Amino acid sequence: MVTYSANYSPSFQRRSPVAVHNRRSNMARMDLNNIVGDPFALITISTSMIAWLLSFVTCVISDIQGLFPNFAWWAVGYMLCAIIGISIVLGSQTSHVYGVAIVGYLAAGLAFTSLAVNSLIYDDEASKQAAAAGFILQSMVIIVWIFYFGSSRHSSSRGYHDSMGAGKEQHHSYRNSKPISNNYGARPETTVSANQPPQMYTSAQLNGFETSSPVSGFPPTATNGADIQNRFGTTLGSQTNLGGGSTIGQDHQSTNEVSQPTEYPYRAKAIYSYEANPDDANEISFAKHEILDVSDVSGRWWQAKKASGETGIAPSNYLILI
């Protein structure tokens, strides 16, 4: 089996231009099922659209009837773009990628809607007061969105919101939406990726290995060979060429292999789908909301076990402990 170190695993190597082209062609796409099947997304988007329509229609009526603050139109247009953008993000399940940007845009939108409310709510016209009510409702939805997108994926509130869509099964590949990072962190050492440390001997153990020949790796004399056999047993003493060291390396490698864990004390739930890299036998694929058994949660990659018995490593930022 080919041995990979943590820094030279195929998962971290630069992909060929063909792979990059295929990756770009498989970018995250909008899927309305992700909104319809998620009560949180469906309720917040529907409420924001109703509030926006209320403010838009009443602003048109107020503008026709008389003087109208032009700043309110900027708030109407800005919130339309914000609602469309958030709908696309929730529909493509890329909130973990654009969450920081969304919070910034929503913070500005909250300021705009608040100023629009202040300029409309104190007027005696019913249409302007209705427009202010629409902006107030939009502000309430914005506050909920800021709390959602601004929270960590591992927070209890975010996990509760994500679990609301548990009845919706996701089959799209995680590669369509996961961020590309070259500084993700080292993976845990497994049987394939473990670095084998060099075998060390003391000076007393190396006594008898000396050779009078200046050529490195020259076969020892019969006396030295017998002494080696007495010190290390028949396995080492039976070798005729110490320079090659093939048997020594194989024996040492077999004793230093990291075995698979036998206990999985933790349970984790997948908050996003993940498709394992076909070039790396250590990774495992899993679907969204799938339950995995985890042996260690200290690193960025967790050793996990599926219900089918398949074991491997999984990225920790796509799992949440339960």
Swiss-Prot record:
Residues 159-184 are annotated as: Disordered. The keyword Transit peptide does not apply. It is found in: Cell membrane. InterPro entries: SH3-like_dom_sf (IPR036028), SH3_domain (IPR001452), Sho1_SH3 (IPR035522). It comes from the Eukaryota. The chain crosses the membrane at residues 41-61, 71-91, 97-117, 130-150. Residues 263-322 form the SH3 domain. The keyword Transmembrane applies. It holds the Pfam family SH3_1. Residues 62-70, 118-129 are extracellular. It is a multi-pass membrane protein. Belongs to the SHO1 family. Forms homooligomers. Plasma membrane osmosensor that activates the high osmolarity glycerol (HOG) MAPK signaling pathway in response to high osmolarity. This is High osmolarity signaling protein SHO1. The gene is SHO1.
